[in-house]
Swiss-Prot record:
Pfam family, any one: FUR
Residue ranges, annotated region (Dimerization): 90-141
Protein name: Ferric uptake regulation protein
Residues holding Zn(2+): 38, 86, 95, 106
Keyword terms: Cytoplasm, DNA-binding, Iron, Metal-binding, Repressor, Transcription, Transcription regulation, Zinc
PANTHER family membership: FERRIC UPTAKE REGULATION PROTEIN, ZINC UPTAKE REGULATION PROTEIN
Family matches, as InterPro entries: FUR, Fur_C, WH-like_DNA-bd_sf, WH_DNA-bd_sf
Subcellular location: Cytoplasm
GO molecular-function terms, A-Z: DNA-binding transcription factor activity; transcription cis-regulatory region binding; zinc ion binding
Length: 141
């Protein structure tokens, strides 16, 4: 899915919130800005040490926690695997998780969104937030 939005400047947002932007944090922010996948902390760590081998895994975990607390990223705990992360910005989308490869595919369906709204309203509710994760196996060709 092409993301039809401009990625926010998290560095500026964090500075405004009084967070010091260290070199390791800047590297991690750049990784998150450039990624098109949903990496886990270990994958972010692997990418970060390619730029600076002094970055520790605990620095990655602390930074991810900080970014999550500030609303800059979303943590996804897809079944059967470690928490994975994505930026909190952009248009709403849902996820298909390939149960064999672990790949995550983003998608949006107006039909699904409309149906969810209709169901919630018919039961006397208004959707405030939701997450849809479809766990799938690829069709055999």
């Amino acid at each position: 899915m092409n993301k039809p939005y401009t990625k926010p400047d998290y560095e500026q947002e964090l500075r405004r919130a009084g967070v010091r932007i260290t070199r390791p944090r800047r590297i991690i922010l750049n990784i998150l800005n450039e990624t098109e996948d949903h990496p886990d902390a270990l994958e972010i760590f692997r990418r970060a040490v390619e730029e600076d081998d002094s970055i520790s895994l605990s620095t990655v975990y602390r930074t991810m926690k900080l970014l999550e607390e500030r609303g800059a990223i979303h943590r996804h705990a897809f079944a059967g695997g470690p928490s994975r992360f994505e930026q909190a910005s952009g248009a709403h989308h849902d996820h298909i998780i390939d149960m064999d490869s672990g790949d995550v595919v983003e998608f949006h369906s107006d039909k699904i969104e409309k149906l969810q709204e209709e169901i919630a309203r018919s039961l006397g509710f208004e959707i405030v937030h939701h997450r849809l994760e479809l766990y799938c196996k690829k069709l055999k060709s």
